[in-house]
């Protein structure tokens, strides 16, 4: 494990100021292809490859940016256009936790209004606790502001599609279109006059762009074609998702997460009577969960949240001593453990599973190319930050590109792309490392490690300024 973490740390560091790295970035990105630009090719200022949540939001943000009013933007999406004529009464099992920072981005180009007019559920508190002890941490806001929102991915996608249609004169969307080849010129200088990226689509057509943005997922074709190294490994876990019905209606404004020895289980509010499940566990157990009958599955969920079977007297006694000491030092505002709502049933056909892993690109940018979202990083869902990291990438990249456009600079120049990389690698690397450490620390019931994490969680819960810093970091 130490070797792996050391390897990860070495590859995650930002090395763009090294002259050797700059020379490498200026080299050919696809060695087997020669620069074959044609004056007949359609030319775009920006091409976004990948029309998922992050790619579509990127195109939206650029299309609505005042300094891009005279730019041509293209969004490539391999799938068909998704129409949402009427909101289904059944909730989707794929949801995202949207942070305040992400709502600011979505509001900046009008998508958040569409989301609020459809459906989303705010949560004002988050309780995280250990199944092997009484340790917990409660995140909340004294001013009663919302900590975040749980939104179905389909709803977010609908809102983004509506806002893309609003800027159709600036942003062209090609559905059922996928790039199958990229050509960069050979070694060239960092000057603004460097040649553009040449893209071949599946139908044989070609185009050119001043900046290619890869938003095509953790198996990114843009990243691979650019020859950007990616540190990645698969976790020994899959995530089980489902839509759950509560036993009784509640205010349901708390997000719950409990760390089990096999992985974390989370309950995210959807409405007063519904919640979304994300249960990370071993591949074998995940397969069992999705194949169980409904009653057995519901019992397994309630037991996972309520049972104290993993407790030991020794750890409970040590935990109680620390808890009493904290109460003496800080007799007020110590969060008390609450219990999550019980589950009554599960929506039919809402159960699904997907494998988990970690990934991080050693570089986010090369001349005329930038990576965002899962193309640049992949994270465990225990942090609830996957799409928020991607939206954070967008906020940073749009800021740098907007400044470049305002100043009449070349959009594909490294002079501002490296600013984006520095901003986001600093944030994302810290979050990835912390999440990976938590995943490993809580994937054991060994007494010494249980004690260590118990005391750490209790201490963190008692220090309000530290919790505020954690919430502020996660809200970006």
Curated annotation (Swiss-Prot):
Specify the domain of life of the species encoding this protein. Eukaryota
**Gene Ontology CC, one term:** extrinsic component of mitochondrial inner membrane
Q: Where is the transit peptide?
A: 1-35
In the record, N6-succinyllysine modifications are located at 219
> Which SUPFAM superfamilies does the record cross-reference, listed alphabetically?
FAD/NAD(P)-binding domain (SSF51905)
Query: An example of a Gene Ontology BP annotation on this entry?
Result: ubiquinone biosynthetic process
Q: Does the keyword Transmembrane helix apply?
A: no
Which cofactors, by name? FAD
- Tissue spec. comment: Expressed in the kidney, in podocytes.
Q: Which Gene3D superfamilies does this one have?
A: FAD/NAD(P)-binding domain
EC numbers on record = 1.14.15.45, 1.14.15.46
Please provide, alphabetically and separated by semicolons, the GO molecular function terms listed in this UniProt record.
2-methoxy-6-polyprenolphenol 4-hydroxylase activity; 4-hydroxy-3-all-trans-polyprenylbenzoate oxygenase activity; FAD binding; oxidoreductase activity, acting on paired donors, with incorporation or reduction of molecular oxygen, NAD(P)H as one donor, and incorporation of one atom of oxygen; oxidoreductase activity, acting on paired donors, with incorporation or reduction of molecular oxygen, reduced flavin or flavoprotein as one donor, and incorporation of one atom of oxygen
What pathway is this protein said to act in by its record?
Cofactor biosynthesis; ubiquinone biosynthesis
Sorted alphabetically, the keyword list is:
Cell projection, FAD, Flavoprotein, Golgi apparatus, Membrane, Mitochondrion, Mitochondrion inner membrane, Monooxygenase, Oxidoreductase, Transit peptide, Ubiquinone biosynthesis
Q: Which reaction does it catalyse?
A: 4-hydroxy-3-(all-trans-decaprenyl)benzoate + 2 reduced [2Fe-2S]-[ferredoxin] + O2 + 2 H(+) = 3,4-dihydroxy-5-(all-trans-decaprenyl)benzoate + 2 oxidized [2Fe-2S]-[ferredoxin] + H2O; 2-methoxy-6-(all-trans-decaprenyl)phenol + 2 reduced [2Fe-2S]-[ferredoxin] + O2 + 2 H(+) = 2-methoxy-6-(all-trans-decaprenyl)benzene-1,4-diol + 2 oxidized [2Fe-2S]-[ferredoxin] + H2O
Subcellular location per the Swiss-Prot or TrEMBL entry: Mitochondrion inner membrane; Golgi apparatus; Cell projection
The annotated topology with respect to the bilayer is: Peripheral membrane protein
UniProt keyword Oxidoreductase, yes or no? yes
Instruction: Please state which protein family the record places this protein in.
Output: Belongs to the UbiH/COQ6 family.
Its assembly, as annotated, is: Component of a multi-subunit COQ enzyme complex, composed of at least COQ3, COQ4, COQ5, COQ6, COQ7 and COQ9. Interacts with COQ8B and COQ7.
Quote the function comment for this protein. FAD-dependent monooxygenase required for two non-consecutive steps during ubiquinone biosynthesis. Required for the C5-ring hydroxylation during ubiquinone biosynthesis by catalyzing the hydroxylation of 4-hydroxy-3-(all-trans-decaprenyl)benzoic acid to 3,4-dihydroxy-5-(all-trans-decaprenyl)benzoic acid. Also acts downstream of COQ4, for the C1-hydroxylation during ubiquinone biosynthesis by catalyzing the hydroxylation of 2-methoxy-6-(all-trans-decaprenyl)phenol to 2-methoxy-6-(all-trans-decaprenyl)benzene-1,4-diol.
- Recorded protein name is Ubiquinone biosynthesis monooxygenase COQ6, mitochondrial
